[in-house]
Amino acid sequence: MSEILFFSPQPLFSHMMNKNSRLHTHSNIKNTFFSEIGIGILGNSFLLLFHILKFIRGHRLRLTDLPIGLLSLIHLLMLLLMAFIATDIFISRRGWDDIICKFLVYLYRVLRGLSLCTTSMLSVLQAIILSPRSSCLAKLKHKYPHHISCAIIFLSVLYMLISSHILLSIIATPNLTRNDFLYVTQSCSILPLSYVMQSMYSTLLALREVFLISLMVLSTLYMVVLLCRHRKQAQHLQGTSLSPKASAEQRATQTILMLMTFFVLMSIFDSIVSCSRTMFLDDPTSYSIHIFVMHIYATVSPFVFMSTEKHIVNILRG
């Protein structure tokens, strides 16, 4: 999704903040945003706890359990961090210094990158699981899960390096009034980057998002083709029912497909809101709508996963 919240060359407020424009005066916007964050924290906490208990009790783990558990942990940390940052956006200036501003924005940036990466990995893994034995992807079915940890560590280091410029560009908002600062929160601002640095950073972000989203789209299309082919084969087998394993795989695949579709739609919506702020309107209301849209995926995704877990569904029904 768009990284415009903290890392765009566009200022988050195109005007100097004053008493009439600060977001903490918009109580409805503030309450809606914190409700979204609260629901997301609750859902991701429950999903993460479910997978931890599943591991401790020695239940048989599926290949997708690790990336799903990791995704819930990433989203939980990201939403908790955003809730803390939002107090400096919607409520009042907390007077953070340079170190706190750099740490919060840098960590948030890395978590957003890992969310995108883990979602892409989950989509690819589900495509590998669903692939038939005759497929070349089937050979990766038992190798891919063992390389997930290495991939996570590698990508974490990579994102930390890509985002390292934030440690230089983020500063505490000075008391002096200057028009060249780009506001992140009431306490934190971004120093303007040179054209070369801005172009290089934007290119790296674009390449990363295009690559990972392309992986998601290709794996999603591949799974759709496999499901359609499997359905046609099942229609020719009169009186033959699907095995429980096949049915479970199909349910898991449909969940991943729904989640990937939702992710892509939210990415498109996020880009539309971002472009509208850049080209037409950039006031506190449009800004708050943007950060609300940015966290819809992290809020909704745990409930999508939990809807397919029989144990959780039975507990909720009981």
From Swiss-Prot:
The chain crosses the membrane at residues 33-53, 66-86, 110-130, 151-171, 207-227, 255-275, 286-306. Residues 54-65, 131-150, 228-254, 307-318 are cytoplasmic. It comes from the Eukaryota. Expressed in a subset of sensory neurons located in the apical layer of the vomeronasal organ. It is found in: Cell membrane. SUPFAM superfamilies: Family A G protein-coupled receptor-like. It is a multi-pass membrane protein. Putative pheromone receptor implicated in the regulation of social and reproductive behavior. Belongs to the G-protein coupled receptor 1 family. This is Vomeronasal type-1 receptor 45. It comes from Mus musculus (Mouse).
